[in-house]
Amino acid sequence: MARGLALILFSLLMVFGSAAHAEDDPIAALIQLNKQMIKSVKDGDMDSAQQTFDTFKAKWKKEEPSIKKENLSSHSEMDANIAMISLSFINQDARKLKTQLEELASHLETYQQAVVLKKTSSGQSRASLTAYIQSLKDTKQFIEKKQLDEASSAIDNLVTSWLAVEGDVVSQSKEAYTTSEENLALMKAEIGSHPEKVSKQIDEMIQLLEPIASSSYSWWDAALIPVREGMEALLVIGALLTMTKKARVTRSSTWIWGGASAGMAVSLAAGIGVTVLFSSSVFGENNFLLGGVTGVLSAVMLLYVGVWLHRNASMDKWREKINIQKSQALKKRSLLSFALIAFLAVVREGLETVIFFIGLVGKLPLTELIGGTAAGLIVLVIVGVLMIKLGMRIPLKPFFLLSMAVVLYMCVKFLGTGVHSLQLAGILPSDAESWLPSVSVLGIYPSVYSTIPQMLILLFLLIALVSEAAKHFTNGKELTK
């Protein structure tokens, strides 16, 4: 296992090292040309500004494909901005032209910062996190100057560039990682209505990230990544294995481990693909999208497991199911569902985990990286074995109640974090309600889009518990008659 892991990490080192050579800044000339246009317009020299704009457009056409590939959102904003500038030149509207050129300058500078954040190879990782912190400070300056449109654009770039630095952050501080992701969503939601809150959220992120930018790595950081990221998936897989063992369902472990293995393969392939085919800033929103979709799907499947557990919580029903050995069709359907849950649970965390490891390559000796990773995986294996062994010793009734509580807890958390990721990806609107609680460790965020579905799940749990208690009360009364 260690030898295979070493080969995988060595391959990732080769891939990451070859993919991380950054090109020269493709838009420095565009920024300079834009400054010349602003100066010409301020001086009232529209002819000179027009000539510079013609040069700018030629340069833009040349660089446009790479800009579009790097950050589609920024490209769309700048392309629309350039179209409006062309119209203002036709109308000879110097006042509008000056405003539009200044807005374009803001977009170009924000994009330039995002390109710097992309450069996360071994010699640039600390500079990247430092640059991210500087981008936070620049965003705060936009807010202080009441330039909210520029601040909103800068926040969008902070979100898409987060993937370039999150590996540095999560390996050093889980608190900084979860708080930063939560704040990014809140910043998107509140920049238009409560910029003063956004300013405080930026200060909090800076305070959390600055110590990390000056810290160093060790094998311990590599060991913590699989433990932190893999524990939730292990909890789901362990519960599934224990349930199917108690149910005496044949070949159940094959299906569940098959789903988990497929999830690991997809995560590894996607992680390598990200480093080879895409830049971090391009993949940033897509990573949030993937995390959101897998989170919500996992929640739906876990809710199915919760219903299944509730239906079989009765000892009589459970013995009846075991005695009659459910129909083969039902077995296959249940096993396929369990395999899919294992797959989603692994993919949900697996892709980010692979990217985190790729981010660590070059930041500490390869022997420490491999040794730390192996140590973390050994801890996961020990926890998994203990979980299954202890689960088999628990009596059937308490086991079902405990399993249902664990499954529904994971369901609530996966749903909350999934919706949160979809908001960061821009699929769902970002909102922040002051009257809603925020407990990131439970996947609870101050958003009605995540809180309402979570409340419905908790309502289901309450109804299930009340229903079960009512049945016991009714059966008890009948026995006393």
Swiss-Prot record:
The record's subcellular location field reads: Cell membrane
**Cellular component terms per the entry's GO annotation:** high-affinity iron permease complex; plasma membrane
Chain segments annotated as transmembrane: 258-278, 288-308, 338-358, 368-388, 399-419, 446-466
Q: Span of the secretion signal?
A: 1-22
Task: Give the membrane topology, semicolon-separated if more than one.
Answer: Multi-pass membrane protein
Q: Name one GO biological process term.
A: iron ion transmembrane transport
**Which InterPro entries does the record match to this protein?**
FTR1/Fip1/EfeU
Disruption phenotype annotation: Severe reduction in Fe(2+) and Fe(3+) uptake and in cell growth.
> What Pfam families is this protein classified in?
FTR1
Its function, per the record, reads: Part of the iron transporter system efeUOB/M involved in iron import. Mediates the uptake of Fe(3+) ions, delivered by EfeM, across the cell membrane.
Task: Please give the family membership noted in the entry.
Answer: Belongs to the oxidase-dependent Fe transporter (OFeT) (TC 9.A.10.1) family.
| PANTHER family given in the database record | IRON TRANSPORTER FTH1 (PTHR31632), PLASMA MEMBRANE IRON PERMEASE (PTHR31632:SF2)
Assembly behavior: Component of the iron transporter efeUOB/M complex composed of EfeU, EfeM and EfeB; EfeU is essential for the complex formation.
- Entry protein name: Iron permease EfeU
Q: Which organism is it from?
A: Bacillus subtilis (strain 168)
